[in-house]
C-alpha cells in the first residue's frame, strides 16, 4: 500500500491555493506538483574548510533530482569548525551545536512537509546532528559528505593539523619551521585528513547504511566526489518513490539504522581506532532512533574486535586517503564480516544488504566491480585546492596487502585488542572512554599522582608552566556536558603534553572529551561528571590514579570511607558543592540552558526533555 505524500498538506486542495502560490514562486513547475518534494540539507559555510567547497554542490544535487521530475529545495544549517574554536571558550559551543543542527533540520523539514532529504554534511557535529534529525523525521534520507582533506606534505612526509598544534608548543622548534608546517598542514578543502571525528562519523555513516560507498574516504578534491553527489541525488528519488508510491518502508532511516546497524558501526569504529567522540554521537543517534544500543554494547564489542586499520593520529604512516586506496570502509567491513564480527544482513539506503555491498565493492572480493575499483583508486593531487572535483588523479594500483598494508585481516591485526575501550572504576562508575589505538602498549597499565585542574585553561597553563612532570596523571574536572557547560575537547592539553615530550610518560583523565586528533593515554567522558556529583570531582592533588586498560579499570587509590568523607565535605559547601572552586568563566544564557537540560556523556550528552 502506498504512503501519502507529506507534502500533500501544502500542495493539494482548494484551501492550499496560497501555499501553492508560494511553491510556484519558489520555482515549482506544474508537473512537479503531486510528486515528492525533496529537501537538500546543506551545511555550506566559509568558516570551515570541510564545508567551504559545498556552496555549489546543493544546486548540483537539486539539478540531478529535478532531472527525474521531483522538486528539490535547499537550505543550510550552522557548522562550527572545532579546530578554529579550539583552545578558547568557543569550544563550549561545539557539542551543543549538534542538537541545534538536529532541531533546525527537524524544524525546516516538518514546517514545509518535505517528503525526503539529502543531507550534505562533513565536519564534527554536523553529521551527527543531521543523523539525529533523520531519525526523528524518519523519512527517506541519503547522506553524502564533503569528503576528507588531502594530507599535507613537508620534507617528504605526511602531516596534518595536529602536527601544527604540537610543534607550535614545542620550544625547541624554530618559528621558521612552525610557519612551514602551518602552510603545509591543511592543503585545501575537506575535513582534516586523519581519522579524526569528522572522518570517523562519515565512515560510520557507511557502516550504518545511510551513506553510499566511498562517502567516508574519497578525498574532497577528486572528481569522483562529484559523482557521489549525483549518485546520492538519484538514490533519494528512487527511495522516495519506493516509500510513497510502492509502500516500501525498508528505505526509512529507522529501518536501516537498527540495533544491529549500530553494532556494526561501533565494530568498525573500534577496528579503525576512530575518534572517541563517535561514542557520544552513536549513543545520541541511537536514542533518537529508538534503537537498543548502549554503553554496555560498546564495552562488549571492544573486548572482541581487533584493530584492523591504524590511521593518523594513531600513526604517521597513513591518513584517510590511504584507507581509500586500501578499499575504504567496505574493505574493513569485509575483514570484519569474514571473522563473523559484523552482521551482513543489515539493510542500506542503496537497497543492498551489507553483505551484497561488500561483495560488490570490497576490492579483495572476486566480484568487485570496475566502478568500485575506480572509486578506490581516487588519489590526492598533492596541490592546494579549495574546489571540490578540481582534480582527477588515480593510484596506479590498489593496496590489497592485508598482512602489512593499511587495512589488515584479523590474522594480521595491528592488535588483538580494538582501538577503543570502556573503563570503569570508583571515579567512573558509569564508564569512560579511551582510544587504545593511540596509546603505546607500554603504558596500558599506568599509575601516578594526580595533578588536578578545574578547567582546560588551567591545565594548559600548568602543563606549559612545567607543573606537570613525568609520571603524573593530569585530571581536568568540571568540563563535562553540564559542568562546562558544553563538554569541551581537550586537544590543546594533550598536544602540549606531547610538545613537552611527555606523551609516553603522563596520562590525562577528564569528564570532558577529546578531539579525534588526540592520541596518547587520554581518558575522557568520565561519568558521572564532577558537576553531577561524580567522584572525579573528589580527586585531589597527589592522589594516586590507577589505570589498567587490559582489565578495563580506572580508580583513585582511596577507600570508600575516604571518598565518603570527601563527599560529605564537598556537600557542606552548599550551593557551591560540585562547582569549580577556582575557575573564572562567563557562561551565556544559551549555554546555561544547555547545561540545565543535558544528559551525562554515557547517555550521549543529549538534552533531556521531560514528557
Swiss-Prot record:
Its cofactor is [2Fe-2S] cluster; Mg(2+). Gene3D superfamilies: IlvD/EDD C-terminal domain-like (3.50.30.80). The modification N6-carboxylysine is found at residue 125. PROSITE patterns: ILVD_EDD_1, ILVD_EDD_2. InterPro entries: Dihydro-acid_dehy_C, DihydroxyA_deHydtase, DiOHA_6PGluconate_deHydtase_CS, ILV_EDD_C, ILV_EDD_N, IlvD/EDD_N. It comes from the Bacteria. The active site is at residue 515. Pathway: Amino-acid biosynthesis; L-isoleucine biosynthesis; L-isoleucine from 2-oxobutanoate: step 3/4; Amino-acid biosynthesis; L-valine biosynthesis; L-valine from pyruvate: step 3/4. Residues 565-574 have a biased composition (Basic and acidic residues). Its EC number is 4.2.1.9. GO terms for molecular function: 2 iron, 2 sulfur cluster binding; dihydroxy-acid dehydratase activity; magnesium ion binding. Belongs to the IlvD/Edd family. Functions in the biosynthesis of branched-chain amino acids. Catalyzes the dehydration of (2R,3R)-2,3-dihydroxy-3-methylpentanoate (2,3-dihydroxy-3-methylvalerate) into 2-oxo-3-methylpentanoate (2-oxo-3-methylvalerate) and of (2R)-2,3-dihydroxy-3-methylbutanoate (2,3-dihydroxyisovalerate) into 2-oxo-3-methylbutanoate (2-oxoisovalerate), the penultimate precursor to L-isoleucine and L-valine, respectively. This is Dihydroxy-acid dehydratase.
Amino acid at each position: 500500500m502506498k504512503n501519502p505524500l507529506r507534502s500533500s498538506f501544502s500542495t493539494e486542495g482548494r484551501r492550499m491555493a496560497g501555499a501553492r502560490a508560494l511553491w510556484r514562486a519558489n520555482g515549482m513547475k506544474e508537473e512537479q506538483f503531486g510528486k515528492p518534494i525533496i529537501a537538500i540539507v546543506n551545511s555550506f559555510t566559509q568558516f570551515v574548510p570541510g564545508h567551504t567547497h559545498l556552496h555549489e554542490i546543493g544546486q548540483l544535487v537539486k539539478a540531478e533530482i529535478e532531472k527525474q521530475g521531483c522538486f528539490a529545495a535547499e537550505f543550510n544549517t550552522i557548522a562550527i569548525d572545532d579546530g578554529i574554536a579550539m583552545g578558547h571558550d568557543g569550544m563550549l559551543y561545539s557539542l551543543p551545536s549538534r542538537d541545534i543542527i538536529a532541531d533546525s533540520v527537524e524544524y525546516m523539514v516538518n514546517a514545509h512537509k518535505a517528503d525526503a532529504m539529502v543531507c550534505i554534511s562533513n565536519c564534527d557535529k554536523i553529521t551527527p546532528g543531521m543523523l539525529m534529525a533523520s531519525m526523528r523525521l524518519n523519512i527517506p534520507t541519503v547522506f553524502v559528505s564533503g569528503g576528507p582533506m588531502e594530507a599535507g606534505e613537508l620534507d617528504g612526509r605526511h602531516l596534518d593539523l595536529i602536527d601544527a598544534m604540537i610543534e607550535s608548543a614545542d620550544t625547541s622548534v624554530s618559528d621558521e619551521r612552525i610557519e612551514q608546517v602551518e602552510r603545509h598542514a591543511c592543503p585545501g578543502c575537506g575535513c582534516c585528513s586523519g581519522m579524526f571525528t569528522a572522518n570517523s562519523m562519515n565512515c560510520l555513516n557507511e557502516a550504518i547504511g545511510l551513506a553510499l560507498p566511498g562517502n567516508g574516504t574519497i578525498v574532497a578534491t577528486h572528481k569522483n566526489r562529484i559523482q557521489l553527489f549525483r549518485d546520492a541525488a538519484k538514490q533519494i528519488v528512487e527511495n522516495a518513490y519506493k516509500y510513497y508510491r510502492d509502500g516500501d518502508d525498508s528505505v526509512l532511516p529507522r529501518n536501516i539504522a537498527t540495533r544491529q546497524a549500530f553494532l556494526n558501526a561501533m565494530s568498525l569504529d573500534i577496528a579503525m581506532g576512530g575518534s572517541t567522540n563517535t561514542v557520544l554521537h552513536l549513543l545520541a543517534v541511537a536514542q533518537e532512533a529508538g534503537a537498543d544500543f548502549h554503553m554496555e554494547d560498546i564495552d562488549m564489542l571492544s573486548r572482541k574486535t581487533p584493530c584492523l586499520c591504524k590511521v593518523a593520529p594513531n600513526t604517521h604512516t597513513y591518513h584517510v586517503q590511504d584507507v581509500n586506496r586500501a578499499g575504504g570502509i567496505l574493505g574493513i567491513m569485509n575483514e570484519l564480516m569474514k571473522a563473523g564480527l559484523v552482521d551482513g544482513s543489515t539493510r542500506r539506503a542503496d537497497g543492498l544488504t551489507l553483505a551484497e555491498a561488500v561483495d560488490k565493492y570490497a576490492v579483495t572480493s572476486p566480484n568487485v566491480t570496475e566502478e568500485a575499483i575506480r572509486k578506490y583508486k581516487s588519489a590526492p593531487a598533492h596541490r592546494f585546492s579549495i574546489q571540490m572535483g578540481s582534480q582527477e588523479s588515480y593510484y596506479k594500483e590498489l593496496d590489497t596487502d592485508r598482512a602489512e598494508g593499511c587495512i589488515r585481516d584479523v590474522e594480521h591485526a595491528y592488535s588483538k585488542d580494538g582501538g577503543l575501550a570502556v573503563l570503569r572504576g570508583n571515579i567512573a562508575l558509569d564508564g569512560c572512554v579511551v582510544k587504545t589505538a593511540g596509546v603505546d602498549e607500554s603504558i596500558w597499565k599506568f599509575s601516578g599522582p594526580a595533578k588536578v585542574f578545574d578547567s582546560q585553561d588551567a591545565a594548559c597553563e600548568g602543563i606549559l608552566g612545567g607543573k606537570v612532570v613525568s609520571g603524573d596523571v593530569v585530571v581536568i574536572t568540571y568540563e563535562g556536558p553540564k559542568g562546562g557547560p558544553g563538554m569541551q575537547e581537550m586537544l590543546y592539553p594533550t598536544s602540549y603534553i606531547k610538545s613537552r615530550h611527555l606523551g609516553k610518560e603522563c596520562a590525562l583523565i577528564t569528564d570532558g572529551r577529546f578531539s579525534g586528533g588526540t592520541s596518547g593515554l587520554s581518558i575522557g567522558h568520565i561519568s558521572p561528571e564532577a558537576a553531577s556529583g561524580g567522584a572525579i570531582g573528589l580527586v585531589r592533588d597527589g592522589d594516586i590514579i590507577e589505570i589498567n586498560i587490559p582489565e578495563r579499570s580506572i580508580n583513585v587509590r582511596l577507600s570508600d570511607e575516604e571518598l565518603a568523607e570527601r563527599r560529605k565535605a564537598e556537600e557542606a559547601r552548599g550551593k557551591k558543592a560540585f562547582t569549580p572552586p577556582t575557575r573564572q568563566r562567563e557562561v551565556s544564557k544559551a549555554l546555561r540552558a544547555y547545561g540545565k537540560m543535558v544528559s551525562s556523556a554515557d547517555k550521549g550528552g543529549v538534552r533531556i526533555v521531560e514528557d
